[in-house]
């Protein structure tokens, strides 16, 4: 193998010290996200309950811990919806506190949403991803962070065996929960990430 464009995060600590390879490890412009359908029960963007739950969920995810421990320092916690390499990127956009881990505030917002419409033991937000793409450890960590903050029965993973299976389910709108998404811009512009 002469060229490898991606190194699994589990191997990232050793590849740079391996004398048999010439490593290249620089930040890129990809952003990894997940999407919650706007009409999903308890998560509807048109309702106060849905808005509170989305805000609580975002604050329940310890992005820094995931970047440090799961991705071995290869990620940067999001503070907006483009990457630090994108022209126009800002780490001080109004409202970016919603993208920062805040266990106390997350619980408070979750309880406000529960006062509107209670989350029951029958409810669970699942996170779909393709198992053949190296996403399992990341989504397990996301789910663990959410459950450790909001309650052990809030979230679960929903892996699909292959990217094709996953993409078909997303495109056919058969995923009944959150699903992995992201973007690699076609050209260096915030517009390409935000309007795409």
Regions found by a protein language model. Give the residues of each.
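Ligand/substrate-recognition segments at binding pockets and active sites
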Residues: 6-10, 111-185
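Soluble non-cytosolic domains of exported or imported proteins
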Residues: 6, 47-52, 60-61, 96-104, ...
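Extracytoplasmic/peripheral linker and loop segments enriched in polar/acidic and small residues
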Residues: 51-55, 59, 67-68, 152-166, ...
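Sec-exported extracytoplasmic/periplasmic mature domains
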Residues: 20, 41, 58-75, 87, ...
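Short, solvent-exposed loop/turn and secondary-structure capping segments
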Residues: 8, 14-18, 68-72, 80-81, ...
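Alpha-helical secondary-structure segments
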Residues: 29-79, 122-133
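Extracellular/periplasmic solute-recognition and catalytic clefts
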Residues: 1-40
């Amino acid at each position: 193998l002469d060229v490898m464009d991606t190194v699994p995060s589990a191997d990232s600590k050793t590849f740079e010290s391996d004398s048999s390879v010439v490593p290249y490890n620089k930040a890129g412009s990809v952003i990894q996200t997940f999407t919650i359908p706007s009409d999903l029960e308890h998560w509807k963007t048109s309702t106060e309950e849905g808005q509170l739950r989305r805000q609580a969920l975002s604050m329940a995810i310890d992005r820094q811990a995931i970047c440090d421990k799961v991705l071995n320092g290869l990620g940067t916690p999001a503070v907006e919806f483009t990457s630090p390499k994108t022209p126009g990127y800002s780490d001080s956009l109004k409202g970016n506190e919603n993208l920062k881990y805040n266990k106390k505030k997350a619980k408070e917002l979750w309880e406000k949403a529960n006062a509107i419409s209670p989350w029951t033991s029958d409810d669970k937000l699942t996170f779909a991803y393709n198992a053949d793409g190296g996403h399992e450890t990341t989504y397990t960590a996301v789910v663990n962070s959410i459950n450790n903050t909001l309650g052990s029965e809030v979230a679960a993973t929903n892996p699909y065996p292959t990217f094709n299976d996953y993409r078909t389910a997303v495109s056919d709108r058969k995923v009944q929960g959150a699903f992995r998404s992201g973007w690699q811009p076609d050209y260096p512009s915030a517009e390409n990430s935000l309007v795409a």
